[in-house]
Amino acid sequence: MKNMLSAFCLAGTALLCSCILPCEAAAAETAQTIKMNMKARIPALDKLKAQGAIGEANTGLLAVLKDPLSAEDAKTVDAENADRTKIYTAIAKQQGTTVKLVGERRARQIHELAPKGTFLQDEKGNWNRK
């Protein structure tokens, strides 16, 4: 299941980057960079999720559940959230909706595919382990 979620995230990122972000040369390079960076972060993020240090928030972003994270781990989480926000912003612009709504939709997808043991935030803000 963990590999399925990772594969889903990669496939979703690839689709979002290739279809939603503008196709100009600079934007395409940025989309490719985002995709590569997100792929590279998967092992570190999976480890932090398995430890219960981070969870998937109802906003479509990661949340720190156990402070303090190491500086390196905090940087990884911040970078992932920044890239997710860029993708959600591009989708919102393309669909004429809000970044918040795109993130919430993505959170529901992530929650469905998250492996057992992942901390997930429900719509009311409560944290539960799947």
Feature locations, PLM:
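Bacterial N-terminal signal peptides that target proteins for export
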Residues: 1-12
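Alpha-helical transmembrane segments and their juxtamembrane interfaces
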Residues: 12-13, 118
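C-terminal segment of classical bacterial N-terminal signal peptides
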Residues: 15-25
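Amphipathic, charged alpha-helical segments and their helix-to-coil junctions
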Residues: 28-75, 79-82, 93-130
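Contiguous, amphipathic alpha-helical segments that mediate oligomerization or scaffolding
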Residues: 88-89
